């Protein structure tokens, strides 16, 4: 792995704004089945994004599918503080950039979800 991916994966686990599977959850799955909170019928986030991820900010939620590094997601969140944004991508190394920026700048209305679409 190049470009510091292992360091980024490790740091991803510290970002409160990033929801992703723990490494054990991925490894416990059968071959071909990828962990996804969207596949879990009774996932604790279901119906509770504003309450749990956005700390009670009862605002509309906008999803950006395939958000990559999250530049567009974080930019929209900065421009529209009365909207909650969730960037979705499968690549943890990409999500690291957006999650790190959101954490460092204290953006309360942005979150990232690592999963397949």
Predicted regions and their residues:
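Conserved beta-strand/loop positions that form the S-adenosyl-L-methionine
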Residues: 65, 88
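Conserved SAM/SAH-binding beta-strand->alpha-helix loop
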Residues: 91
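S-adenosyl-L-methionine
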Residues: 1-63, 71-78, 100-117
């Amino acid at each position: 792995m190049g470009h510091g991916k292992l360091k980024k994966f490790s740091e991803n686990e510290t970002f409160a704004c990033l929801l992703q599977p723990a490494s054990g959850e991925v490894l416990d799955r059968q071959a071909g089945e990828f962990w996804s909170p969207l596949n879990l019928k009774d996932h604790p986030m279901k119906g509770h994004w504003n309450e749990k991820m956005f700390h009670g900010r009862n605002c509309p939620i906008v999803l950006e599918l395939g958000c990559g590094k999250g530049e567009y997601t974080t930019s929209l969140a900065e421009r529209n503080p009365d909207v909650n944004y969730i960037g979705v991508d499968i690549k943890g190394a990409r999500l690291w950039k957006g999650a790190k920026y959101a954490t460092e700048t204290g953006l309360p209305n942005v979150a990232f979800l690592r999963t397949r679409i």
